[in-house]
């Protein structure tokens, strides 16, 4: 049925949308707006809420080349998802022990989210 396909692609749970509303205020820009990122802090993190699509939201912003989502899954463990229009984010992910594709990659950084963010942005800053 067409509506089932549409629902599978477009419909989000209420929990996911409520989480997005909490995370969007964290939107931050770096490197003259070429990088935009969202952060899910430890107090917001809920393993039962689907947040994988959140990394796409910063990509919709004019001038943004690299979109990142930092997810603090434990006090000293940060999961990172990256999407890019032209930067090889897989090279950055591999440098942090992760992997992926040229334009979509991720890694886990064993550091608090603030420290992980600083490390990753420094590495990406050399590429944008």
Where are these regions (language model features)?
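Hydrophobic helix-and-loop "lid/oligomerization" segment in the mid-to-C-terminal part
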Residues: 1-96, 100-128
């Amino acid at each position: 049925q067409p509506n089932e396909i549409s629902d599978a692609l477009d419909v989000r749970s209420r929990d996911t949308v409520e989480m997005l509303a909490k995370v969007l205020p964290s939107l931050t820009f770096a490197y003259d707006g070429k990088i935009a990122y969202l952060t899910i802090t430890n107090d917001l993190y809920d393993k039962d809420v689907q947040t994988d699509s959140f990394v796409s939201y910063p990509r919709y912003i004019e001038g943004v080349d690299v979109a990142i989502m930092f997810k603090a899954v434990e006090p000293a463990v940060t999961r990172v998802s990256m999407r890019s229009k032209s930067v090889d984010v897989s090279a950055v992910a591999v440098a942090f022990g992760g992997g992926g594709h040229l334009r979509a990659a991720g890694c886990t950084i064993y550091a608090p989210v603030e420290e992980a963010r600083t490390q990753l942005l420094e590495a990406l800053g050399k590429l944008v």
